[in-house]
């Protein structure tokens, strides 16, 4: 290894990545993890990624400190140093060995799970991938050469190193013994690491002096920790496993050394020497601390895929550190240290895991210390915390310990997690863990031991999520960052064997996994794409690291970060272990089959390289975040608020995701797909080596982290295929894998990846068996409290077992109930939907992990975005027992995860703030950040919802609440692609647009009115609000909407009510009961705003709702403690009382009582009491007004006394008090009877008039009141019409004429209640006519628009006849008064003229019209005469020709030539004059002698126009135009004088023309008729001037 590493020093990027991978792989040992991390940084100091990551993390940290400008300069300097720092090949080799050793242990079990999970190792493309920039520092692009000479191979998933032939032995050995072995082996590596660190520190120190001067405090912390690491490393032995530890420490120390070198090279050396004096554990712990600090500040150490593996074994130990973190919260450092020690001894396959615990503890303490330096979080010294943690780890059971740290598990407790479980060191590294999860996923695919792999993946997921949240800084250090969250988690799970660890990890991952699952596609189809372009990844990682660093710094300020990280780590682990829950429940470890995979080492190398590259999260950052989390936990315990701020409301999972360095770096739980940038990274590592089994679903965060770290992407192939954006950024799309994992097909890349794996025997050796865990052990799984959300992470893991998935569903269905914001996003299609089985299994894992964590219930409330549950419709209701168990675990996880979530949210918010400036890191990161940002926006967590397992199975569990940063879109809406298809299919089929059964007029939008979803057109041409007169439509719509009682429909009804009655007043169709029902429904659906709006509008339109509605509003406000709504409610109440609402004393007392409950002010209560006193003054002394029976008795009394004024007052009182409109109508009918029947004629007054006068004085009269009063008047009118009491009837009509338009109303009683409108109008007109009021009669007719018989107002033939007689009578009377216009109006509206339905012969009206025409002509009313003539001609009414001729003559003499010519032409068509056509064109005009001069002139005009062509032609000047004055038969009998007068009229006609015409007398014909000739010149002149209009009038306008 050393030779190889040294040989590859030239390849800075690859060697750095590889070294980092090796370091992470060696992170199995707690100390080695630290050493490895440091070594990675040292070795990777040679590799550019290491330097970059540390640089970026430190810069992120600086950003958090507000020194963003320095970050860029430091980055540049560190980059320069990176090139210089390519020096520690030995360290690389050591790290690789250590990583391989640790990986061997995990790989045993991972290989077991490999077949099922198709763990895709990093393909050789990983080698090509230099370090990911996001994880720059620690990211080791593990090249094949990095493998040990002993054929140590990197597990693709965890990045752990396969122990060479002795791995199986090490597995068999007691975890303690393994740990012991590891410790000595770590010593030489630590020495090497120390040297490397020294070198790196020197390089960094040289160029970073200015930077150090600015950030002395932070670097000092880093330096102290680095020195400790160096001393520890020097003190550690040279065993292979310990080499792994050393390598891990080396990585962490390299990072630390980098910063420390930046701070003081000598100082690091001195501190390292001093630290060397301390014991191994203490050194390891310190190394961890320092490495964590370094990571935290540096953020440059990118965890390679190996780092997650190393971190996983370290996680095993870190479980104890995790316990220690809890202890730190409890301030029981010593006990926690003992537990760590025990945990270290307990891990089955990974001796390195124990050192990682110590390391993790040390890292925690160092992190805390550094945090305390930067942000005073803990006063406890890092060394003391480390020692205590180490002791606890030794003596305490590695059982899941509540995040709060209230309890530590005794070493003798039953359930323990195998050492194989990666010490949750990897978990702390959120981004690392994400990558690590991917690596673990790969390993899981590679190994059959799903439990182990899942646990590791879960740990990784949890770590990644926690890292994401705690700090993107952790992204830099693969193993170190991993160590921290894992340590927290491992303390809880380490108690038992691998299973227990897995369960813990599952629980941890459960929280994160839930969130991660939303982001990640199901692990079943997860593919790990390691592209040769690691530089891109490294750049992305570096960005993320910077983001993470800043976030980590912020997280350090927020103590809650630790808890959040823990939970996040736990959730991620749960994600990785879908089947682990089953194993834990069933305890059937024997059922695990260890699949044989070929070329496992190569894949592992690739994966490790990827994981190391991506897992850039530094353990220091994790420790900082954890220490912050501890403080935050305490704060959280004190403060029940789940979310301190909007960003803090982010779920743990979101915060855990380290991949997203920027504010967008946080993945939303709902996003099932990793952003395209992640895919890009994953695919950039061209070999898509990582494919997770169906059982392995990495939470979205975990997947995202995996993609960053391992360049892997976990998702269902189908889902991936559906997501073009997945491939948009990817160089190569995911390829289907032929091999099946857990019965699922893996992508072809998996087979390709297999080529790089080592021997099958080694795979067996690397695997570790799980030990049965007591399923119902409350100590292990914790006690869940009902009502709490099971997963803060909220995304169920997808397991291959549908039963498990159902369990998760049951547990997560509670989350499902929480409202999920489903906002359409471009990425919606891009998110693959996890398989139901894998989701279930992951849910179980997350449940178990969550149960182990046991945090305060205060944090149980998860922000809305965090509480979503994913279940696939394909899941079957099987395995209820498992589901129940998982749900229990889930509940437990809920509790613990909730606390972690809150803390993690806080951390995330801090990280988000610090990294908000780095929004452009990666597209995928941005998507994840967008998803995470949404929870940040939620200020208040939602209460947990409980669902039964059956309900959970049936419910379609949404993805994690679609939390998104501004401008971001949720990546996933539906959990299952089939569900998506069904949804689309149903939408296309219009399933959701099913008509509601309303009959809507065509002019209205049927979608808006008649469907639940409403109109979706951007611009609809149809009306969305009823128009005036369609109040009945409004009422029908309201009734239908109220009956359906859908929230959207009720809101629409409220809007429709507001829009309609703002424009139009209530009419006869207004139903007060509908209003009350609408208000009641709105109130039931908590639509208080709409209720207030409608109530205020009702006050304006004087339609008061029922009193019970008002009381319900007060009750609602008091129950919900809506103090802010009290002022508006009091104001509305006062208006209602002023408007006439009557309240009893009891009502006022009740309202006051409610106001006291809501803590209303004295002024508000006083206002209510004042209204009470005012109302008393307005009320009658008797209470009968509210009693209808008493009111009726009062009415009888009024009737007997004839006190109609008092009756009006009673009417008003009843109107205000009566709640039901129907009752009020019946009351009005009774009033009408009183006013009409049994009235004594001798009484001069009209009861209705006095009654109407009193009622009309009320200013509060609405349109409905007027309508009812009018209907009472109609009944009275009928009554007097029957009695022929025309005067009284007219008084009634006069009163209605003043106040009400009654022509469209009907009576309330008797036949008038069903009488047609024509009949009512006829009776009213007749009363006016009989009483001598023609104006009144015409007013009634005009108000009714002269309607007789229409489809809307049908009537009988008798009514039509009555109308005819009535109009004729009125016409004669009006004509007698020379009211021609009114007469003509009446005649025009006779039956038969309005529509075709009136089959009346209009010719019978000839006498009336001719009489009118004659009268108009006689009176010289030419305009009216002309109108009457035109109407008669148009309606074919026979007209008297004499009247028409007189009209034409009068019009001509009055110079109204246009009308005269028109009527003359009409007269010609009617035959009034002899035809002219026969002689017109013969140049001969025959004019009857009886015509007037006007008629003669008009005849001459026609003659000239007809012969215009011949007259105007030049050759016809000699032709003669003759006019013959024809004698008629009548004229023959007359005297000569008459004919002579005709001759004079002819001459006059020629003169009055314009221009004048000249005629000559030529001769007398045989009939003694005078013959005249028309002079050609005058005719030609006339044509020139009048030809244009002449042609139009006489030739073309023939009728």
From Swiss-Prot:
Compositional bias annotation for Basic and acidic residues: 168-183, 805-832
InterPro entries from the UniProt entry: TOPAZ1, TOPAZ1_dom, Znf_CCCH
Taxonomy, superkingdom: Eukaryota
Tissues where the protein occurs: Expressed in both adult testis and fetal ovary, mostly in germ cells (at protein level).
Example GO BP: cell differentiation
Alphabetical UniProt keywords: Cytoplasm, Differentiation, Spermatogenesis
UniProt feature, compositional bias: Polar residues: 874-884
GO cellular component: cytosol
Disordered as annotated region, ranges: 1-42, 159-185, 802-836, 867-889
Gene Ontology terms, MF aspect: metal ion binding
Major localization class: cytoplasm
Compartments where found: Cytoplasm, Cytosol
Coiled-coil annotated residue ranges, if any: none
Record bears the keyword Cytoplasm: yes
Cytoplasm among keywords: yes
Known function: Important for normal spermatogenesis and male fertility. Specifically required for progression to the post-meiotic stages of spermatocyte development. Seems to be necessary for normal expression levels of a number of testis-expressed gene transcripts, although its role in this process is unclear.
Name of the protein this chain belongs to: Protein TOPAZ1
Source organism of this protein record: Ovis aries
């Amino acid at each position: 290894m050393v030779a190889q590493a040294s040989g590859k020093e030239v390849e800075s990027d690859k060697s750095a990545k590889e070294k980092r991978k090796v370091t992470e792989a060696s992170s199995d040992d707690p100390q080695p993890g630290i050493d490895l991390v440091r070594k990675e940084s040292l070795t990777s100091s040679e590799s550019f990624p290491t330097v970059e990551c540390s640089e970026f993390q430190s810069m992120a940290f600086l950003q958090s400190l507000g020194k963003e400008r320095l970050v860029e300069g430091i980055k540049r300097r560190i980059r320069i140093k990176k090139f210089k720092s390519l020096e520690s090949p030995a360290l690389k080799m050591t790290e690789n060995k250590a990583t391989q050793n640790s990986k061997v242990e995990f790989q045993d079990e991972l290989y077991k799970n490999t077949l099922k999970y198709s763990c895709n190792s990093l393909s050789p493309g990983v080698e090509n991938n230099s370090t990911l920039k996001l994880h720059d520092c620690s990211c080791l692009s593990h090249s094949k050469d990095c493998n040990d000479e002993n054929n140590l191979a990197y597990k693709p998933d965890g990045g752990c190193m396969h122990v060479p032939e002795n791995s199986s032995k090490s597995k068999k050995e007691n975890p303690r013994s393994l740990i012991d072995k590891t410790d000595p082996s770590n010593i030489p590596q630590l020495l090497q690491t120390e040297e490397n660190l020294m070198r790196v520190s020197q390089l960094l120190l040289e160029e970073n002096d200015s930077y150090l001067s600015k950030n002395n405090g932070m670097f000092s912390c880093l330096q102290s920790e680095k020195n400790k690491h160096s001393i520890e490393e020097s003190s550690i032995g040279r065993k292979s496993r310990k080499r792994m530890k050393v390598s891990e420490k080396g990585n962490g120390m390299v990072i630390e050394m980098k910063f420390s070198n930046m701070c003081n090279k000598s100082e690091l050396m001195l501190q390292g020497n001093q630290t060397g004096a301390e014991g191994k554990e203490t050194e390891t712990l310190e190394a961890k601390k320092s490495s964590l600090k370094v990571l935290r500040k540096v953020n440059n150490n990118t965890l390679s895929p190996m780092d997650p593996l190393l971190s996983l074994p370290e996680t095993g130990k870190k479980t104890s550190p995790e316990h220690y973190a809890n202890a730190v919260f409890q301030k029981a450092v010593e006990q926690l240290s003992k537990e760590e020690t025990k945990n270290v001894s307990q891990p089955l396959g990974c001796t390195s895991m124990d050192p990682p615990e110590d390391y993790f503890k040390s890292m925690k303490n160092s992190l805390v210390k550094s945090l305390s330096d930067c942000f005073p979080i803990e006063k406890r010294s890092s060394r003391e915390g480390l020692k205590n943690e180490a002791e606890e780890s030794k003596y305490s059971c590695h059982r899941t310990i509540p995040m709060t740290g209230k309890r530590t598990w005794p070493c003798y407790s039953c359930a323990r997690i195998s050492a194989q479980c990666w010490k949750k060191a990897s978990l702390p590294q959120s981004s690392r863990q994400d990558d690590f999860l991917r690596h673990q996923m790969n390993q899981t695919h590679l190994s059959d031991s799903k439990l182990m792999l899942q646990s590791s993946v879960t740990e990784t997921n949890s770590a990644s999520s926690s890292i994401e949240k705690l700090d993107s800084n952790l992204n830099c250090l693969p193993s170190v960052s991993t160590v921290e969250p894992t340590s927290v988690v491992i303390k809880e799970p380490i108690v038992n064997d691998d299973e227990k660890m897995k369960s813990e990890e599952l629980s941890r991952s459960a929280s994160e996994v839930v969130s991660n699952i939303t982001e990640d596609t199901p692990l079943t189809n997860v593919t790990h794409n390691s592209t040769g372009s690691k530089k891109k990844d490294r750049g992305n990682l570096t960005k993320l690291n910077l983001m993470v660093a800043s976030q980590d710094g912020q997280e350090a300020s927020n103590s809650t970060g630790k808890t959040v990280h823990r939970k996040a780590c736990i959730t991620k682990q749960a994600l990785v272990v879908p089947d682990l829950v089953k194993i834990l429940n069933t305890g059937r470890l024997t059922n695990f089959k260890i699949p044989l995979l070929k070329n496992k080492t190569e894949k592992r190398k690739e994966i490790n390289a990827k994981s190391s590259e991506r897992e850039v999260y530094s353990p220091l950052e994790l420790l900082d975040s954890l220490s912050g989390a501890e403080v935050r936990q305490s704060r959280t315990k004190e403060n029940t608020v789940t979310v301190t701020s909007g960003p803090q409301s982010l779920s743990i999972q979101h915060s855990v995701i380290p991949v997203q360095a920027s504010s967008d770096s946080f993945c939303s739980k709902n996003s099932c797909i990793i952003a395209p940038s992640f895919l890009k990274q994953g695919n950039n590592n061209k070999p898509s080596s990582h494919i997770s089994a169906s059982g392995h679903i990495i939470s979205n965060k975990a997947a995202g982290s995996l993609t960053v770290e391992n360049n892997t992407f976990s998702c269902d192939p189908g889902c991936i295929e559906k997501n073009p954006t997945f491939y948009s950024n990817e160089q190569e799309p995911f390829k289907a894998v032929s091999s099946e994992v857990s019965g699922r097909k893996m992508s072809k890349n998996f087979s390709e990846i297999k080529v790089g794996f080592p021997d099958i025997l080694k795979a067996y050796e690397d695997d570790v068996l799980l030990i049965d865990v007591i399923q119902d052990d409350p100590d292990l799984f914790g006690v869940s409290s009902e009502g709490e959300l099971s997963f803060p992470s909220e995304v169920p893991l997808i397991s291959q077992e549908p039963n498990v998935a159902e369990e998760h569903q049951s547990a997560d269905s509670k989350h499902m109930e929480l409202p999920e914001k489903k906002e359409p996003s471009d990425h919606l299609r891009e998110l693959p939907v996890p398989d139901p089985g894998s989701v279930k299994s992951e849910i179980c894992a997350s449940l178990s992990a969550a149960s182990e964590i046991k945090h305060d219930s205060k944090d149980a409330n998860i922000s809305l975005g965090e509480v979503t549950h994913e279940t696939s419709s394909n899941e079957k209701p099987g395995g209820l027992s498992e589901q129940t168990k998982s749900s229990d675990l889930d509940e437990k996880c809920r509790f613990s995860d909730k606390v972690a979530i809150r803390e993690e949210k806080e951390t995330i918010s801090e990280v988000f703030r610090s990294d908000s400036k780095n929004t452009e890191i990666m597209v995928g990161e941005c998507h994840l950040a967008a998803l995470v940002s949404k929870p940040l926006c939620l200020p208040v967590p939602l209460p947990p919802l409980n669902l039964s397992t059956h309900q959970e199975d049936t419910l379609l569990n949404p993805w994690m609440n679609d939390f998104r940063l501004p401008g971001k879109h949720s990546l996933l809406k539906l959990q299952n692609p089939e569900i998506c298809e069904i949804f689309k299919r149903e939408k296309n089929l219009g399933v959701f647009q099913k008509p509601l059964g309303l009959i809507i007029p065509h002019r209205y939008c049927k979608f808006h009115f008649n469907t639940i979803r409403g109109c979706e057109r951007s611009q609809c041409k149809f009306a969305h609000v009823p128009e005036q007169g369609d109040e009945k439509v409004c009422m029908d719509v309201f009734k239908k909407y109220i009956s359906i009682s859908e929230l959207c429909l009720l809101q629409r009804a409220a809007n429709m009510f507001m829009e309609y009655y703002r424009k139009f007043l209530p009419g006869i169709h207004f139903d007060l009961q509908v209003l009350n029902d609408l208000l009641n429904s709105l109130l039931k659906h908590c639509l208080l705003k709409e209720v207030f709006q409608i109530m205020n509008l009702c006050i304006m339109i004087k339609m008061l709702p029922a009193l019970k509605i008002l009381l319900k509003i007060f009750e609602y406000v008091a129950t919900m403690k809506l103090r802010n709504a009290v002022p508006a409610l009091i104001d509305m109440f006062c208006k209602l009382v002023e408007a006439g609402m009557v309240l009893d004393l009891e009502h006022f007392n009740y309202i006051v009582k409610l106001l006291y409950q809501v803590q209303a002010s004295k002024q508000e209560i006083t206002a209510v009491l004042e209204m009470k006193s005012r109302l008393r003054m307005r009320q009658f002394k008797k209470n009968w007004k509210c009693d209808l029976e008493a009111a009726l008795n009062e009415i009888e009394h009024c009737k007997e006394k004839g006190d109609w004024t008092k009756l009006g007052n009673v009417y008003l009182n009843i109107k205000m008090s009566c709640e039901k409109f129907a009752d009020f109508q019946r009351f009005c009918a009774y009033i009408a009877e009183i006013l009409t029947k049994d009235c004594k004629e001798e009484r001069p007054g009209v009861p209705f008039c006095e009654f109407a006068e009193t009622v009309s004085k009320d200013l509060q009269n609405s349109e409905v009141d007027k309508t009812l009063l009018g209907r009472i008047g109609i009944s009275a009118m009928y009554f007097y019409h029957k009695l022929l009491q025309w005067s009284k009837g007219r008084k009634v009509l006069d009163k209605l004429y003043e106040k009400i338009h009654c022509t469209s109303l009907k009576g309330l009683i008797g036949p008038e209640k069903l009488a047609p409108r024509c009949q009512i109008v006829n009776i009213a007109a007749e009363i006016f006519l009989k009483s001598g009021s023609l104006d009144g009669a015409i007013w009634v007719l005009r108000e009714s628009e002269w309607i007789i018989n229409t489809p809307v107002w049908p009537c009988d033939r008798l009514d039509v006849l009555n109308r005819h007689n009535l109009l004729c009578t009125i016409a004669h009377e009006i004509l007698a008064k020379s009211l021609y216009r009114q007469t003509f109006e009446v005649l025009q509206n006779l039956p038969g003229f309005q529509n075709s339905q009136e089959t009346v012969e209009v010719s019978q009206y000839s006498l009336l019209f001719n009489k009118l025409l004659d009268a108009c002509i006689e009176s010289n009313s030419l305009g009216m005469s002309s109108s009457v003539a035109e109407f008669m001609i148009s309606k074919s009414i026979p007209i008297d020709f004499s009247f028409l001729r007189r009209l034409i003559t009068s019009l001509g003499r009055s110079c109204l030539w246009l009308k005269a010519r028109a009527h003359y032409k009409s007269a010609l068509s009617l035959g009034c004059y002899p035809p002219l056509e026969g002689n017109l064109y013969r140049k001969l005009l025959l004019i009857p002698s009886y015509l007037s001069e006007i008629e003669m002139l008009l005849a001459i005009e026609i003659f000239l126009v007809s012969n215009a062509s011949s007259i105007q032609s030049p050759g016809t000047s000699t032709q003669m135009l003759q006019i013959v004055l024809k004698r008629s038969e009548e004229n023959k009998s007359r005297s000569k004088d008459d004919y002579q007068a005709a001759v004079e009229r002819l001459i006059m006609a020629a003169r009055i023309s314009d221009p004048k015409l000249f005629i000559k007398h030529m001769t007398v014909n045989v009939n003694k008729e005078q013959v005249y000739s028309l002079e050609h010149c005058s005719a030609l002149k006339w044509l020139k001037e009048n030809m244009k209009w002449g042609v139009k009038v006489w030739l073309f306008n023939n009728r």
